[in-house]
Regions:
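Rossmann-like NAD(P) dinucleotide-binding subdomain of oxidoreductase/dehydrogenase enzymes
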Residues: 124, 128-269
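ALDH superfamily catalytic-core signature
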Residues: 235-316
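A general structural signal for well-ordered alpha-helical segments in protein cores
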Residues: 50, 72, 108-109, 115, ...
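Residue-level signal for inorganic ion chemistry
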Residues: 32, 68, 90, 112, ...
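Glycine-rich phosphate/pyrophosphate-binding beta-alpha loops
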Residues: 43, 158, 280
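Generic non-transmembrane alpha-helical segments
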Residues: 74-78, 82-85, 191, 195-201, ...
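N-terminal Rossmann-like NAD(P)+-binding subdomain of aldehyde/semialdehyde dehydrogenases
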Residues: 1-138
Length: 316
């Protein structure tokens, strides 16, 4: 793989790249060295992004479903073309093995492909209302409509996958958005922004803003946002929900996943699976194994093998 990072990366404000500074340093997670720089948004830039998203909403509503689908399919094609660049950037900024990075890029492509397919299948329903003589001949209709400008805050552990889970459905539904990617791993979302900027999305449809705490409260409290989607720790997520006002809030927080091991389980196989589930990516996954419930008849045998194999893990 012959790839390298650029010297600097912009943020994206109302569909356009902007390089006001190079304040955010991105580290190679393996060496700990700064390898590139990213533009950092301040409160004024965040405000401009929200204004643009709010102004753009009517234009997003008026996009035909096939037009939104074309945007998403363009992204699918471009992600495939730039597959190695995405994988390399993820490998460096997140410290993932290149095999896992490639897997996450594939998941990015799949997510946008599914969103493209669903963008033309946003249905409504007709239902009878003739429950009495007075209502004879009456029917009711409902349809799904875009909720409005969305605020997205994505985490560091799956910079592409978890950004895609927010961005692609928003485009499919016709919702403008402003995203704050994790400061530790901003490159994935910025690369997505670069490809979105090639499309005919109306100005203001998206902004991708790495940001410090200066002004970041706007992602949570600003009433022009009609939905906040946050992926991260329970402590932060519940605090954001408490301060978010009347907007809808979607929280994807840390889990408490359990494994149940019965007495007739293949212990060698189970031990390998539990170790992988618990220690993959240093346990930095919302579905990492955090509880192991073992039948008492095999507890000692499982514990012995589990400890032996865990001691052989190599960090770094």
């Amino acid at each position: 793989m012959k790839n390298k990072l650029r010297d600097k990366y912009p943020l994206y404000l109302a569909n356009e790249p902007l390089q006001p500074n190079v304040s955010l340093k991105v580290e190679d997670k393996y060496t700990g060295e700064a390898v590139t720089s990213v533009a950092l948004a301040d409160a004024e830039i965040i405000e401009r992004a929200i204004v643009a998203a709010d102004d753009c909403f009517e234009k997003m509503i008026n996009m035909a479903s096939y037009e939104r689908q074309e945007v998403l399919l363009h992204c699918v094609q471009r992600f495939r073309e730039d597959f190695d660049e995405f994988a390399y950037a993820l490998c460096v900024e997140a410290g993932k093995p290149i095999r896992d990075s490639r897997g996450e890029v594939s998941r990015l492509i799949d997510t946008f492909k599914i969103a493209a397919e669903e963008s033309t299948r946003i249905y409504g329903e007709i239902q009878p209302l003739d429950i009495s003589e007075r209502a004879k001949g009456y029917r009711g209709m409902w349809k799904r409509v875009p909720i409005g400008p969305c605020s997205f805050i994505s985490p560091f552990n799956f910079p592409l996958n978890l950004a895609a889970h927010k961005i692609a459905p928003a485009i499919a539904a016709g919702c403008p958005f402003v995203m704050k990617p994790a400061s530790k791993t901003p490159l994935g979302a910025i690369l997505i922004g670069g490809i979105l900027a090639e499309t005919n999305l109306p100005k203001g449809a998206f902004s991708i803003l790495p940001a410090s705490r200066d002004g970041s409260d706007l992602f949570t409290i600003d009433e022009r946002f009609k939905l906040l989607s946050f992926t991260g720790s329970p402590e932060v997520g519940w605090d954001l929900k408490a301060r978010s006002g009347k907007k809808k809030v979607v929280l994807e927080l840390g889990g408490n996943a359990a494994v149940i091991i019965d007495k007739d389980s293949d212990i060698d196989s189970v031990v390998d699976r539990v170790i992988f589930g618990a220690f993959y990516q240093s346990g930095q996954s919302c579905i990492s194994v955090q509880r192991v419930i073992v039948h008492e008849k095999i507890y000692d045998k499982f514990k012995k093998k589990f400890v032996e194999k865990t001691k052989k893990l190599i960090s770094g």
